[in-house]
């Protein structure tokens, strides 16, 4: 399609080198890798909006299920998670910014921790968060 300048994969869109490659190219660029090829790390992303009460912390991305009706594994890759220590750290930063409610987000939250060497369930993660951050008034779970 002549109107398309570049195609960028979900993993590649997060890499600064992708945009340098596009900028330096004089022709359309296809930068879509195999999303199942290697395990992608996800970093917790603090989502802050000034003058808001609710802060979002991504704890999981991707999905290991291959439901016939769903495209998520092909767009997000296999399930991967952020470790509990980093999650607590991110929530603490949001609480310091006076957020009153924290929302843990992910594509398939129920799979949280299944890829960890020391398996940890979502309920165990919630207990860790509440024990380490007693000042947290509200904790919500949200999934796609």
Q: What is each residue range found by the language model?
A:
Residues 118-139:
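Alpha-helix-loop-beta-strand connector modules within alpha/beta enzyme cores
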């Amino acid at each position: 399609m002549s109107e398309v300048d570049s195609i960028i994969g979900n993993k590649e869109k997060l890499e600064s080198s992708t945009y340098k490659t596009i900028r330096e190219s004089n022709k359309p660029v296809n930068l879509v890798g195999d999303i199942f090829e290697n395990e992608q790390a996800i970093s917790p992303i603090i989502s802050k909006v000034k003058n808001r009460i609710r802060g979002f912390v991504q704890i999981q991305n991707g999905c290991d299920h291959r439901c016939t009706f769903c495209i998520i594994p092909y767009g997000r890759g296999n399930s991967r998670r952020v470790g509990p220590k980093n999650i607590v750290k991110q929530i603490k930063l949001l609480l310091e910014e006076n957020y009153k409610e924290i929302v843990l987000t992910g594509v398939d939250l129920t799979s949280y921790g299944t890829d960890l060497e020391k398996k940890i369930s979502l309920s165990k993660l919630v207990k860790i968060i509440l024990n380490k951050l007693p000042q947290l008034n509200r904790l919500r779970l949200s999934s796609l």
